[in-house]
Regions:
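Class I SAM-dependent transferase core
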Residues: 2-81, 117, 124-132
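Mobile beta-alpha loop/short-helix "lid" or hinge segments that flank ligand
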Residues: 33, 91-96, 139-141
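Alpha-helical structural signal in soluble globular domains
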Residues: 11, 26, 103, 194-198
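Conserved SAM-binding loop of SAM-dependent methyltransferases across substrates and taxa
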Residues: 93-106
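Conserved class I S-adenosyl-L-methionine
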Residues: 80-92
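S-adenosylmethionine
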Residues: 106-224
Length: 224
């Protein structure tokens, strides 16, 4: 195993993924990283094309929320929902949607992205990686039909203002969740104070990203 592969595999273990699934997921993610590097300059997918930075700042950052999202998925299944519908809003290059879809093959993932060229990239990645549980929707978040999804994720997306929060709440089914990947707790509190009329309660889960131990990362979980 080379240093590049071990960086990813060690990180996946630390993020709590199922041991038996890690080799397959790691192989898919290495292929995905290669696709990002190949198309990044043309599609402006991420802020780096360096392999190790992509592993740490994007793939492992996405998987740092794995355990919490697995817990939320289990709680939704306990409500009797047979086929969970998740969405990644403003998916861009597919983060965290593609990594999460690879880890939860039993859950349907919709990657929502308004830019058509990025949608073409996402469709290509889903095909190459064999992610049969992924579909790509070329649409503005505001145009998603009401109560379409059980859980939505977003990362490096717009701030949670009044308009965006109403849009997100509208597309989630009753009892569903939206999960935001965010940075500093001070900024989160400021954002959430501006929408306290819409979100009465929320949970902040501190994320430990392997390789980014000195950077503050949090997951904000809101329930409808």
């Amino acid at each position: 195993m080379g240093n590049k592969e071990s960086l990813l595999i060690d990180g996946l273990k630390k993020c709590g993924l199922k041991e038996e699934a890690i080799p397959t997921i790691a192989e898919k993610m290495e292929t995905y990283i290669n696709e990002i590097i190949l198309f990044n300059s043309a599609y402006n997918l991420t802020n780096t094309s360096d392999h190790d930075e992509l592993v740490i700042r994007h793939i492992l950052d996405s998987y740092a929320g794995y355990k919490k999202i697995a817990e939320l998925a289990e709680s939704l299944k306990n409500l009797g929902i047979e086929k969970l519908q998740f969405a990644d809003i403003g998916s861009g290059g597919g983060l965290p949607g593609i990594p999460l879809a690879a880890a939860f093959p039993e859950i349907e993932f919709t990657l929502v992205e308004r830019m058509s060229k990025r949608c073409a990239f996402l469709e290509n990645c889903a095909a190459i990686l064999g992610l049969k549980n992924v579909k790509v929707l070329n649409k503005e978040a505001e145009k998603i039909p009401a109560e379409s999804f059980d859980l939505i994720t977003f990362r490096a997306f717009r701030p949670l203002d009044q308009k965006m929060t109403k849009t997100l709440l509208n597309m989630i089914k009753k009892g569903g969740f939206f999960v935001a990947y965010k940075a500093k707790i001070e900024n989160i509190k400021e954002e959430m104070s501006g929408i306290e009329n819409l979100i009465k309660e929320y949970q902040v889960e501190n994320l430990l990203v392997p390789g980014l131990e000195d950077s503050e990362r949090n997951l904000v979980v809101c329930v409808k």
